[in-house]
Amino acid sequence: GSQPMGAVGVSDKIYNAIVDNGPEHGVEFFHGYTYSGHPACVAASLATLDIYEKEDIFARAEKMSPYFLDAVFDAFKDVPAVTDIRGDGMMAAIDLAIDKTPGVRGYDAQKKTFANGVHIKFTGDCGIIAPALIAEEKHIDEMIQKIKDVVVKY
């Protein structure tokens, strides 16, 4: 499940400009959304931050990043339908060659990879590959192979 959580962060200069120029006795950052100040959202967010800290999630992701990026580049570098590969950290993108109409190939690839057990988000013909920050080598290998199984058929 998930909980909606948002925050507003501004510098002192911006905050003071809003406060100094706002209505007297007015609320500086009025939001009034149904989730504003929701205690369950705050509790879920704090628990998530605790997990990230205790399990050192970002360090794990940083350690896994070279493996992930190498896997992406190695898998798709010789695939004719892939025109560009790029990535940073635990996120990568592959561009598929346009086949007559832009976006058709990406849409088809998104449907087929999802049916194959992997969700890769395509915007037009650009697919974003972003494994969970806790992914292990075996998860990355499986994910990349399932995406490649679809993409090599174009």
Language-model segment annotations:
Residues G1-Y154:
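Conserved N-terminal phosphate-binding loop of PLP-dependent enzymes in the Aspartate aminotransferase
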